[in-house]
Structure formats: C-alpha cells, structure tokens
C-alpha cells in the first residue's frame, strides 16, 4: 500500500 502511495506521489512531482 505505502509503496503504491509513494509511487503515485513521486509521479506527481
């Protein structure tokens, strides 16, 4: 879960 969340956040930036 955290992995996907961090990945999506990093993709935004």
Curated annotation (Swiss-Prot):
It comes from the Eukaryota. One of its GO terms (cellular component) is extracellular region. The keyword Secreted applies. Expressed by the skin glands. Keywords: Amidation, Secreted. It is found in: Secreted. The modification Phenylalanine amide is found at residue 13. This is Temporin-1R. It comes from Pelophylax ridibundus (Marsh frog).
């Amino acid at each position: 879960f955290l992995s996907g969340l961090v990945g999506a956040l990093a993709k935004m930036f």
